[in-house]
């Protein structure tokens, strides 16, 4: 299960709206355990300049910097997020091929009218599997 505070969901949605019609992407920082809890997000650069409408590739330096930030805050990178402009919040074949095991992937459907659903996924041996995503109050999402 992945817990995402509502205020951080709004940050992700804002990023998706600002980047529309391109895919935006970023890192999810938080606490790992039986329940993964996202406590911070970090925007990343989409390196797929020619195909940002339907592809994303996170700049490796953003991952290095995000990992450093996470460790400084006693957190880990629990996953990544990206938007799907004018498409459902489900992994594409491209997404599934490039997903790393262990990490959670939050996908945000977005359109010219605004944001749609947000879903979470993990790569398992059998392919991408939807992960339970629970939206929590900002207070509950704080790192204690």
Regions found by a protein language model. Name each.
Residues 1-77, 85-144:
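Conserved beta-strand-loop surface patch within small alpha/beta domains used
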